[in-house]
């Protein structure tokens, strides 16, 4: 797609704004007493847990479609501050779209939508909400800047600028693994991504 149509900032939710992986422990600690994100989430879809502790992995999969769990997820540190700064910086440049993926619709969709509406209110940024439902997250064609924790989604995107938020499941990947772009970055947090975006000369 021509660059003239690529104006949006697209922001993922789980692993970027919402701390999902860091909140499994209470649900599986009876099966994996020493569970930590750092020790056990070694790759996408938790291959170590899936192989060695299938019952724990099944519980985690159930959490992915649990409305109460989805709504209860805490925001990472400085998400509100980052969203406020991004909203001010980008308001005359294009649309901010928060694009999330769920495996199910219905109540879990409503929970995620409510979570995002509250983020809108807290940050006072009227971002667009886009929720993909199904096996895979859809790829948006108007994205100029993509902020994600999924290497696969970054590779699929034609975004000009790509930001991988470092999480335990993507610890083995670098900027070179994110697919074609004008520039790619690996950063520690959404807030750090916002600071970098503000330094880009568009």
Explain the meaning of each model-derived region.
Residues 70-75, 79-112:
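Substrate-recognition element of Asp-dependent hydrolases with the DxDx(T/V) motif
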Residues 145-185:
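Acidic, Mg2+-coordinating phosphoryl-transfer loop and its flanking beta/alpha structural elements
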Residues 18-21, 25-26, 94-96, 105-111, ...:
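Short catalytic/ligand-binding loop motif for oxyanion handling, primarily in non-cytosolic enzymes
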Residues 129-134, 180-193:
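Short acidic-hydrophobic, aromatic-tinged amphipathic segments that line or gate anion-handling sites
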Residues 99-147, 151-155:
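Substrate-recognition "cap/lid" segment bordering the active-site pocket of phosphatases
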Residues 34, 43-84, 88:
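Metal-dependent phosphoesterase signature
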Residues 138-140, 192-202:
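Short amphipathic alpha-helix with an adjacent loop that forms part of the alpha/beta core around
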Residues 2-59:
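Active-site neighborhood of HAD-like aspartate-dependent phosphohydrolases
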């Amino acid at each position: 797609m021509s660059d003239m149509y690529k104006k949006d900032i697209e922001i993922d939710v789980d692993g970027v704004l919402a701390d999902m992986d860091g909140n499994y422990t209470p649900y599986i600690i009876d099966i994996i007493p020493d569970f930590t994100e750092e020790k056990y989430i070694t790759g996408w879809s938790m291959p170590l847990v899936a192989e060695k502790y299938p019952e724990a992995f099944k519980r985690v999969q159930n959490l992915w479609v649990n409305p109460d769990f989805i709504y209860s997820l805490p925001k990472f540190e400085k998400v509100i501050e980052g969203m406020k700064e991004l909203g001010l910086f980008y308001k005359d440049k294009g649309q901010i779209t928060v694009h999330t993926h769920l495996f199910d619709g219905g109540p879990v969709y409503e929970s995620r939508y409510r979570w995002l509406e509250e983020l809108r209110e807290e940050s006072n940024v009227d971002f667009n909400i886009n929720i993909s439902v199904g096996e895979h997250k859809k790829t948006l064609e108007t994205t100029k800047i993509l902020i994600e924790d999924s290497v696969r989604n970054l590779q699929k995107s034609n975004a000009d600028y790509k930001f991988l938020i470092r999480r335990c499941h993507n610890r083995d990947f670098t900027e070179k693994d994110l697919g074609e772009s004008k520039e790619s970055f690996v950063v520690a947090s959404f807030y750090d991504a916002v600071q970098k975006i503000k330094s880009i000369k568009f």
